[in-house]
């Protein structure tokens, strides 16, 4: 008998019910009780969705972020929040976003830092530690969910983040060693496991994904210490790893005193033989055999071919699951009513992935003949995709093969370009700009919806969008910004917008996944070779530039970010797909330049998140990623200024690669880290211009003029003032005009003060 289970289920709801409830609560439209009821309804639905599994995860639901949930379970709440009055949920949202529902300005606090969850597009709230951090157990949330789940009749498996990964994910605020806290933390984990065991829980999934990263001796010792301390727990521990291979941590993972080990068999299939040999015979081995991070059907027959000898050896010690939490997958393919039927047949979302796990387990336990129809249907779909002429475009392949090194080079060095751009643009010191998008009002979203549904003709839609663009331009002129943007009213998403206009893409209606908090994204699906049939942005940017004498930025998403924020075909190397995207963006850049656009921004917000988790593999990734950007950006004259933007990035370890992109201006997200990201520039003299973000757009809080000046002065300690720009952290799409106007006015006023300081000096 094979045990089937799941590491986690998407929490947002098939139609984003959680998102809408969160935002209604924050705006005071619904009560806390109503928000909690939505959460309870979603949990019940999701447990029913997983009822075919032998073990159902509990504790994977969150009102914002699972790492923040763990922080509250362990009593790790920043003092700036814990001193405020209010209930636990209010303080929870204050850490997450700087304020809770209907907080007045006096209750606003600095939101917790947010960064990427390993190499995914999910973001977590970074735990904050000091040498004096104390831990205290608060299991109420988890216990309440266990009580709910028991009522469904499911056999439950609580899910928690392991103690060593939790410390690894956090940040020391006083330069103390995070691992010094481990001995203080472990008794709280032991108490939590005892509480869970007393609830009748047999298995607890304890996630230690750092085991797929490069660990030094100190962190390996910490893992040994942690699990030898926790081994007396009455509950059995399933140690879960995901997102990669164990490699040099394989022996350690096998030897830790736990009841079982889950591994990512999508990325780590080559290690399974060694795992079978090394894992003690009293432990279970859970294999993640269905890809939890992509949307392609599993080739079930091929998977069974290699799984059969594994099952023959392990028998009931073999467990099957997706490779990682299905948090990274859309919920239900059956919701897709408008997708091309052939392409839809190639896909599997979260619910379908659980079906695949069950089919595999049944085929192994009871024989393939018991699921012959399901296996035949799966084989037909896999074969259809493999042989479809829609996937392959010979002209695109020829264009990629014709790429030369010269296509990635600018005509002159940065100093020459900078002089020519300064002469052409005539910008002041500390030039102000924004990152691209402006608030997406209800009117904008309604117009796009009506256009998609055929209620608006092309000319009617164009008129409405031009009105929004003009409004955005006038707002920026009134605020006094130096370099303007058109506001992106016509764009639903910075990746999906481009994908809709590229051949080789298909789109879902409800393929939403959580990015952070209430922010959901609907990644487009790359199913075939990529090409650009026609210009994608030129009409809108030309119109915006016609409204003003100030420079108007052309706004594009870069090839690496489009790749990393899409569901990508898995039948060819990612690098090859990225080069196809680079050629499409290059053609758009050249069209914008021909249209008279003087500044072109090519966002590479997701450059860093594509890095492999192991540093040994970075060089190969950065080589083709930087090369792709340069191919996209560098077919222009010296006088054309190329910008790029990056989000949530630590730069110390890839600063040379970023410099190698050779963008004239780079804007980065730094406000939540209080400019700490600029530490990268202490030992590396970045040669070009840079705009460190001074306005945290992920929080509704409005930065003061004084605060912005202080941040920019910190930046000027590292970057020469004549190479600094003043800008928000990221696009303003998710904010409203009532927040944006005063924030940008303070930013413009701060820039004026900085210029006056330079003149006075």
UniProtKB/Swiss-Prot annotation:
Catalyzes the transfer of a methyl group from 5-methyltetrahydrofolate to homocysteine resulting in methionine formation. This is 5-methyltetrahydropteroyltriglutamate--homocysteine methyltransferase. It comes from the Bacteria. Its EC number is 2.1.1.14. One of its GO terms (molecular function) is zinc ion binding. GO terms for biological process: methionine biosynthetic process; methylation. It is an enzyme of class 2 (transferase). It comes from Hahella chejuensis (strain KCTC 2396). The keyword Transmembrane does not apply.
């Amino acid at each position: 008998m094979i045990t089937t289970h799941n590491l986690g289920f998407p929490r947002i709801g098939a139609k984003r019910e959680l998102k809408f409830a969160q935002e209604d609560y924050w705006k005071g439209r619904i009560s806390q009780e109503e928000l909690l009821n939505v959460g309870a309804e979603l949990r019940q639905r999701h447990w029913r969705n997983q009822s075919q599994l032998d073990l159902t995860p509990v504790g994977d639901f969150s009102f914002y972020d699972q790492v923040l949930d763990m922080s509250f379970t362990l009593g790790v709440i920043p003092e700036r929040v814990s001193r405020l009055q209010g209930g636990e949920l209010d303080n929870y949202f204050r850490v997450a976003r700087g304020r809770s529902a209907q907080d007045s300005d006096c209750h606003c606090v600095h939101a917790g830092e947010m960064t990427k969850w390993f190499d995914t597009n999910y973001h977590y709230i970074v735990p904050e530690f000091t040498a004096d951090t104390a831990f205290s157990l608060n299991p109420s949330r988890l216990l309440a969910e266990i009580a709910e789940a028991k009522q469904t009749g499911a056999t439950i498996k609580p899910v928690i983040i392991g103690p060593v990964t939790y410390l690894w994910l956090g940040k020391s605020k006083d330069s103390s060693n995070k691992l010094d806290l481990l001995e203080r933390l472990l008794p709280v984990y032991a108490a939590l496991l005892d509480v869970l065991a007393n609830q009748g829980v047999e298995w607890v999934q304890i996630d230690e994904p750092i085991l797929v990263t490069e660990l030094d001796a100190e962190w390996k010792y910490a893992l040994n210490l942690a699990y030898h301390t926790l081994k007396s727990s009455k509950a059995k521990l399933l140690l879960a790893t995901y997102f990669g291979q164990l490699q040099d941590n394989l022996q350690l993972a096998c030897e830790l005193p736990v009841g079982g080990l889950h591994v990512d068999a999508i990325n780590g299939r080559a290690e399974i033989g060694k795992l079978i040999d090394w894992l003690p015979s009293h432990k279970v081995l859970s294999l993640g055999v269905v890809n939890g991070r992509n949307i392609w059907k599993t080739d079930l027959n091929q998977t069974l071919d290699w799984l059969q000898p594994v099952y023959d050896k392990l028998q009931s010690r073999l467990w099957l699951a997706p490779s990682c939490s299905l948090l990274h997958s859309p919920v239900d393919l059956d919701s897709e009513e408008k997708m091309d039927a052939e392409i839809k047949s190639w896909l599997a979302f979260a619910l379908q992935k659980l079906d695949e796990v069950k089919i595999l387990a049944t085929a192994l336990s009871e024989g393939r003949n018991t699921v012959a129809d399901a296996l035949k249907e799966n084989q037909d779909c896999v074969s259809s995709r493999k042989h479809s002429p829609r996937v392959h475009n010979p002209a695109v392949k020829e264009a990629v093969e014709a790429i030369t090194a010269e296509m990635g080079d600018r005509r002159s060095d940065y100093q020459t370009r900078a002089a020519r751009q300064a002469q052409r643009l005539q910008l002041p010191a500390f030039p102000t700009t924004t990152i691209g998008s402006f608030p997406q009002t209800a009117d904008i979203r309604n117009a796009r919806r009506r256009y998609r549904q055929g209620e608006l003709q092309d000319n009617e839609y164009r008129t409405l969008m031009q009105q929004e663009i003009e409004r955005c331009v006038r707002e920026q002129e009134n605020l006094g910004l130096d370099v303007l943007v058109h506001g992106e009213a016509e764009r639903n998403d910075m990746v999906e917008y481009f994908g809709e206009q590229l051949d080789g893409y298909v789109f879902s209606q409800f393929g939403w996944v959580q990015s952070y908090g209430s922010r959901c994204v609907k990644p487009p699906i790359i199913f075939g070779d990529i090409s650009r049939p026609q210009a994608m942005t030129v009409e809108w940017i030309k119109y915006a530039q016609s409204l003003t004498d100030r420079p108007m930025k052309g706004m594009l998403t870069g090839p690496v970010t489009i790749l990393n924020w899409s569901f990508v075909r898995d039948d060819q190397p990612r690098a090859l797909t990225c080069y196809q995207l680079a050629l499409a963006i290059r053609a758009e850049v050249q069209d914008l330049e021909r249209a008279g656009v003087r500044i072109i921004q090519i966002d590479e917000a997701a450059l860093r998140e594509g890095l492999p988790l192991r540093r040994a593999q970075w060089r190969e990734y950065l080589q083709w990623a930087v090369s792709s950007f340069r191919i996209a950006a560098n077919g222009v004259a010296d006088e054309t200024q190329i910008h790029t933007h990056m989000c949530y990035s630590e730069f110390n370890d890839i600063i040379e690669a970023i410099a190698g992109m050779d963008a004239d201006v780079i804007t980065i997200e730094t406000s939540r880290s209080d400019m700490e990201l600029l530490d990268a520039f202490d030992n590396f003299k970045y040669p070009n211009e840079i705009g460190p973000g001074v306005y945290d757009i992920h929080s509704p809080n409005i930065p003061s003029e004084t605060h912005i000046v202080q941040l920019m002065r910190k930046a000027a300690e590292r970057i020469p003032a004549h190479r600094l720009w003043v800008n928000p952290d990221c696009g303003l799409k998710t904010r409203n005009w009532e927040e944006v106007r005063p924030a940008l006015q303070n930013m413009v006023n701060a820039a004026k003060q900085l210029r006056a300081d330079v003149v006075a000096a």
